[in-house]
Each structure stands twice: as structure tokens, then as C-alpha cells.
């Protein structure tokens, strides 16, 4: 495995070109958290209430802003304020997938104005390298960062093989704006260091019947070299106490990171 993953997050921060990557790695070390929670709720009040509860235990809050039924600018302002209060970054999981000029408008404009408040967003690379360039023209001057979807955790995903290889190639050309990947593992042989965020993490279940396949924090961080675990329903699903579960996943993720460091 790439020797850089056996360095601490704070040591790796120094080698990152993107300012959000530097901030994120330093924040993770400071909070002792490599947990990102995917807040896929549809009501503004429920989202803000949950984020305020779990904010102290996460490094990143991941949103799907287009599923919020009562979205408004006040929600954005309150979410940003909670990020400052609890010291986490906001990742809008937009998965852009259009040509460069269109994604520029989707990122900067429209109802959501994503670039104005989300530190991090992501994209598919199906349209070609132009999608990265388009998003970069908006996000780089604002000090934002982009994750590329090199793989997906759902069963039967087509994001494999040559698709993944081309994505890695384009990443290397844009490390001022791109700082990592949404993927289930760390990729070998990349010249630049980067952050890997892995979805599909669960401590209690192995799947959801809709194609989602779950793995443990230890599997993805120790065995696969990932850096951040993304957990959703495992934290706030029916019958769960979000604070208790956020603490549990944070501890499991951090323990796995410490185990990885001890191997070198």
C-alpha cells in the first residue's frame, strides 16, 4: 500500500495543494474524527436538529440539498453557522454529470448556489475532463475542493476498469482543485497524495436490499487505505440514538486509523 497512508493526517496536510484538503486533514486530527455523516433527510428543521447533535463528532457533514422539501437561504446560513460552531466542513453530494458549461451554472447559480456554501462537492467523469475544468472555474477562486467519483459502492456499478483509470489520470492534472475520490479503496501508483472518502460503511448490517453493500471502518481504513468513512442510516436510522451512534462510528473510525499508523 502507498506509504503515505501510514503518515498522520496532519503530516499529510502539508503535502496537499488544495486548501480545503489541508483544512480537512488538520481538522480531522484536531477533532480525532474521520467520520462523515450523510444527512439524507427532507425537512429543514430535522436536518438542522440532527446536525447540531452530531456536529461535535464529525469532520464532514454530507448533504443532498435537492431532496430538502422546504429549502431556503436561511437553512444554508444556519448550516454554515453550525459548521463554524462544531468545526466541520460541508460536502454537497451533488454528483455533477453534465458538460462543463452546464455544471458551471449548476454549481454557481440556480436555487441552491452550491459553490457559495459547500466546501466540497463531487462529480462523475463520464462527460470527460471538461466537467472538472468547468467546476474548477467556479470553485477554485472560492477556495473550494472537488472529489471525483472513481468507484461506487452499489452492486453492479459500471464505474470500474477504464472509467476508473481515466478518472485517476484527470485527477493528476487538476490537484489544485481536485483533492481526492469517493471510492471504496485507495488507488495505487498516483504521484499526488489525496483523500479517499468511502461510503457504504456499517457496523451492524451488510446490505439494504437496494444494492447498497456495507463494510466496516476497519475494512476500509486498515485494509483498503481509505481516509474518511461515510455513514448515513447507521447513525440516525429508525430506533437509533444519533449521538450514541455518531460517537460509536467516530471511535471505530479513529481506532482503525490508529491501527493503520501502528503498522508502519
From Swiss-Prot:
SUPFAM superfamilies: Ribulose-phoshate binding barrel. One of its GO terms (molecular function) is orotidine-5'-phosphate decarboxylase activity. Keywords: Decarboxylase, Lyase, Pyrimidine biosynthesis. The keyword Cell membrane does not apply. The keyword Lyase applies. Pathway: Pyrimidine metabolism; UMP biosynthesis via de novo pathway; UMP from orotate: step 2/2. Coiled coil: none annotated. Substrate binds at residues 40, 62-64, 93-102, 214, 233. The active site is at residue 95. This is Orotidine 5'-phosphate decarboxylase. It comes from Schizosaccharomyces pombe (strain 972 / ATCC 24843). The gene is ura4.
Amino acid at each position: 500500500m502507498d506509504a503515505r497512508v501510514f503518515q498522520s493526517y496532519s503530516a499529510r496536510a502539508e503535502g496537499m495543494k488544495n486548501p480545503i484538503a489541508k483544512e480537512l486533514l488538520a481538522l480531522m486530527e484536531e477533532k480525532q474524527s474521520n467520520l462523515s455523516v450523510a444527512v439524507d433527510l427532507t425537512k429543514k428543521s430535522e436536518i438542522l436538529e440532527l446536525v447540531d447533535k452530531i456536529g461535535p463528532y464529525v469532520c464532514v457533514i454530507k448533504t443532498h440539498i435537492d431532496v430538502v422539501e422546504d429549502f431556503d437561504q436561511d437553512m444554508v446560513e444556519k448550516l454554515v453557522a453550525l459548521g463554524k460552531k462544531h468545526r466541520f466542513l460541508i460536502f454537497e453530494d451533488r454528483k455533477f454529470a453534465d458538460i462543463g458549461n452546464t455544471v458551471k451554472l449548476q454549481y454557481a447559480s440556480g436555487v441552491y448556489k452550491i459553490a457559495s456554501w459547500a466546501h466540497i462537492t463531487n462529480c462523475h467523469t463520464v462527460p470527460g475532463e471538461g466537467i472538472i475544468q468547468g467546476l474548477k472555474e467556479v470553485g477554485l477562486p472560492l477556495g473550494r475542493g472537488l472529489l471525483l467519483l472513481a468507484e461506487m459502492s452499489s452492486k453492479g456499478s459500471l464505474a470500474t476498469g477504464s472509467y476508473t483509470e481515466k478518472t485517476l489520470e484527470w485527477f493528476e492534472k487538476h490537484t489544485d482543485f481536485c483533492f481526492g475520490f469517493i471510492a471504496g479503496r485507495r488507488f495505487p501508483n498516483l504521484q499526488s497524495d489525496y483523500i479517499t472518502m468511502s461510503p457504504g460503511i456499517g457496523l451492524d448490517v451488510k446490505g439494504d436490499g437496494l444494492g447498497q453493500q456495507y463494510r466496516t471502518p476497519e475494512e476500509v481504513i486498515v485494509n483498503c487505505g481509505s481516509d474518511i468513512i461515510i455513514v448515513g442510516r447507521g447513525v440516525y436510522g429508525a430506533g437509533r440514538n444519533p449521538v450514541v451512534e455518531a460517537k460509536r462510528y467516530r471511535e471505530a473510525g479513529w481506532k482503525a486509523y490508529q491501527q493503520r499508523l501502528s503498522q508502519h
